[in-house]
Amino acid sequence: MGVAARPPALRHWFSHSIPLAIFALLLLYLSVRSLGARSGCGPRAQPCVPGETAPFQVRQESGTLEAPERKQPPCLGPRGMLGRMMRRFHASLKPEGDVGLSPYLAGWRALVEFLTPLGSVFAFATREAFTKVTDLEARVHGPDAEHYWSLVAMAAWERRAGLLEQPGAAPRDPTRSSGSRTLLLLHRALRWSQLCLHRVATGALGGPDAGVQCSDAYRAALGPHHPWLVRQTARLAFLAFPGRRRLLELACPGATEAEARAALVRAAGTLEDVYNRTQSLLAERGLLQLA
C-alpha cells in the first residue's frame, strides 16, 4: 500500500508556517508591551521565573570544558567575535560591584553581531535587542549622561526623577520606557542567550538536539513573561533551529568540535557572570517586576 501524498494546499501552508512563526515570535521577543502586560507579579512578589535562585543569582552552570591542548582558536582571539564579546561584557563588571552601562551595551552589540549569522531564530531576536541597545546608548550619551554611566547610577536617578514605571504595568508609550525597564528586558534576553549557548556547547551526542535545548532555555528564561500565544509560537519556531554541529561551526570557524565547545562554555560563563551581577543589583533595588 502506498502512502498518500499531502494535498498541495497543506504542503503550501506548512512551507510558510515556520518562517511566519519565527517572525511572530521574535518580533515580540523583547516587546515592551507583551512583556509588561503579562508580568502577573505584584510589587512585592518574587521573580516570576520558576526554579530561579530568586531574587539574587542563578546557580553557576558554565563550568570548564577542556579541549585538547592547542593554540587558542581564532574565535577567542582579538579579532574573533566570541572573544570580542567576552572582553566587552567582562569590562562591564566594575570592581566596586556595579555594572558599567557603556561596556555592557558594547558587549550586547558584539553579542548581536555574533548571534545574527547563527540562524533566523537568532536574527529576529537580535533586531529587537539592537533596538533596546540603541535606546540605552542614547541615554548614555545624551543630556543626562552623568546619570547613565552605570546600572546603580541609572536606577537611583530614575527613582529620584519619578521615571520608573509601576511594577508590572506596561508604559502607554513603549518609546518612553525607563532605562531601568529597558535594561531588565535585555537582562532576561541575556539569560536566554547564556543558557542556549551553554547547552549547545555541553550537549551530549545522542542527547536532545540544540533546538530542544534552546527551546527549554526559552521556557525557563522568557516563557514565564510571555503570553500563551507567544509561548506556543516559540515551540513551533524552534523546529527550524540549526543543528548542534552547524552552530558550533558558525560560532567558532576553523576550530575542532572540542575547541568550539570549550570556547562556547567560556563565553557562556562570561554571560553568566554578567547576568548574576545584574540580577543582584536589580533585585536589591526592587526592579525585577518593572516588566
From Swiss-Prot:
Pfam name, any one: GLTP
Listed GO CC annotations: cytosol
A molecular-function term among this protein's GO annotations: ceramide 1-phosphate transfer activity
Key words of the record: Glycoprotein
The keyword Electron transport appears for this protein: no
Residues carrying sugar: N276
Taxonomic superkingdom: Eukaryota
InterPro entries: GLTP_sf, Glycolipid_transfer_prot_dom
UniProt key word Hydrolase: no
GO biological process entries: ceramide transport; intermembrane lipid transfer
Family according to the record: Belongs to the GLTP family.
Protein name as annotated: Glycolipid transfer protein domain-containing protein 2
Species assigned in the record: Homo sapiens (Human)
Gene: GLTPD2
